């Protein structure tokens, strides 16, 4: 590793000399050629630093590459970001953001979208859900512009799940419901994804329950059954019907029993569990109106 570092330092020194030559060097050499050669040496330095596991220095060498050849800067900023992810995620994001802006402004929307999604994944991994949601939203917009519907859908679902994992206030819930409905409808349009629609619709229904809107849950469920008849006969569709009936009857034991039976066969993930716990609160809040 020490040998790699010394080679990296040597390349870096040569690159700096190419970048800032003396008076005679400036007179007798072409600036564009000098910068191109300097960039190549900085790149070599970066790769040697990488082999020597000095990721911060490797990233700095790629940043110097970007300064030498601005037309390729997005590529070098992206490389710097990849290296810094190992040591400093906030610095990595800074360089990823620069790369995204350059890619988007030059019309390379697909590449910008992929990088924006990477940023979102870093924030999600660091449990910074608000920032993750913002970046997944932006990534979804870019994927839509690039006509990459499948990846856009996955980003929309991330927004819906992470935003409601972070906060179950009414506005956040309603936005998430719309996203689940939109993606569910899109899934139904393709044979490969139509069987995934029921999961989107189930998540939307339990969000209505968590929002203490039993009428909305009933109406939505009927609407989803009309759109996707297979949902009505699925375990998720039946569970949604049973939970609504339990809430209507203010029957906590039955609500818990139905969830227990379902969970024994198909374990509920953390997100569904959190939403269903909030939905269970409706059993305390909901009472049938007394018309006697």
Task: Go through each PLM region and give its residues.
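Internal amphipathic alpha-helical repeat/solenoid segments
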Residues: 1-70
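Amphipathic alpha-helical segments of tetratricopeptide repeats
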Residues: 16-17, 46-47, 54, 66-67, ...
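Residue signature of alpha-solenoid helical repeat architecture, marking inter-repeat boundaries
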Residues: 2-6, 10, 29-36, 56, ...
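TPR repeat positional signature
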Residues: 4, 11, 35, 41-42, ...
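Structural motif corresponding to the intra-repeat A-B loop/turn of tetratricopeptide repeats
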Residues: 32, 51-52, 71, 86-87, ...
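Structured C-terminal portions of repeat-based eukaryotic scaffold domains
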Residues: 137, 149-292
